[in-house]
A protein has these predicted regions:
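Metalloprotease/metallohydrolase-associated module, dominated by Zn2+-dependent proteases
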Residues: 36-37, 42, 49, 75, ...
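Auxiliary, metal-adjacent structural segments of Zn-dependent hydrolase domains
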Residues: 25-77
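N-terminal low-structure segments adjacent to metalloprotease catalytic domains
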Residues: 1-15, 220-224
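Catalytic Zn2+-binding segment of zinc metalloproteases
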Residues: 106-127
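Short, solvent-exposed loop/turn segments at secondary-structure junctions
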Residues: 59-63, 78, 84-86, 108, ...
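Acidic/histidine-rich, surface-exposed loop or edge segments in extracytoplasmic proteins
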Residues: 9-27
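Short pre-active-site segment immediately N-terminal to the catalytic Zn-binding motif
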Residues: 69-70, 78-106, 159-164
């Protein structure tokens, strides 16, 4: 009986201690870039970015990334849908090659932000223009088409444009094509996106010529 009383007393003390000194629940909501992800980005942006300031964030922004399944990068942080945040701990070793060029597509928005561009304003501007509601089909889009804000015709009507003449989403798409065509050629090379990237890589290189020479140049930021 005495041991039972002692046991009950210990339990009460443990409960009191827990109430007075609660252990905070650690919830994984954001992370830094991994060394592998930084190496990926340096192939494109060189030392134009402060990589230590970049975060990968779980959800946020009123839950829009999780509801839509799309990443959003309004202020230098990449907000992923909840499930993708939990599943992809390092984009540089992601099993799905699509995830790699998805990540690279978002990094130009980090670049735009760090060089002083207001991505939120550009996003609202594209939304008002119907850029995220109208699907368009061109030679650069997937067979299912793409939202108007992202659409390019790099081997046709857009071939002679400078990089700063593309909107902020198109800039992300162009760099995405460059990365897939130039750095993912040994990863499932028969993918539709890769084949398209290879086909237009000469046009992409011409459009990116100033960016590839000096990615720190603020004159390359989108003017539309």
């Amino acid at each position: 009986m005495g041991s039972v009383v002692i046991g009950v007393a210990k339990m009460r003390k443990m409960r009191a201690d827990a109430a007075n000194n609660p252990t905070p629940l650690q919830v994984d909501v954001e992370r830094l870039l991994t060394s592998g992800e930084i190496a990926m980005c340096q192939q494109i942006f060189k030392n134009a970015l402060n990589y230590s300031k970049v975060r990968i964030v779980r959800g946020g922004i009123l839950g829009i990334p999780t509801l839509t399944g799309n990443a959003m990068t309004p202020a230098g942080y990449i907000h992923l849908p909840n499930q993708e945040y939990l599943n992809i701990k390092d984009f540089s070793i992601a099993k799905n090659t699509t995830d790699k060029h998805w990540f690279i597509h978002e990094m130009p928005h980090v670049w735009q932000y760090q060089l002083g561009e207001n991505a939120v304003w550009h996003g609202i501007n594209q939304l008002c223009k119907g850029g995220y509601g109208t699907t368009v089909l061109t030679v650069d889009t997937p067979k299912s088409g793409d939202y108007k804000a992202y659409v390019t015709d790099l081997s046709g009507a857009d071939a002679n444009k400078k990089f700063n003449e593309f909107n902020f989403e198109q800039q992300g798409r162009i760099i995405e094509f460059w990365y897939d065509g130039g750095y993912l050629q040994h990863e499932n090379p028969y993918r539709e996106h890769h084949q398209k990237s290879i086909k237009i890589i000469g046009y992409v290189e011409y459009i990116l010529r100033d960016f590839l020479h000096n990615p720190k140049d603020k004159n390359l930021l989108p003017k539309v």
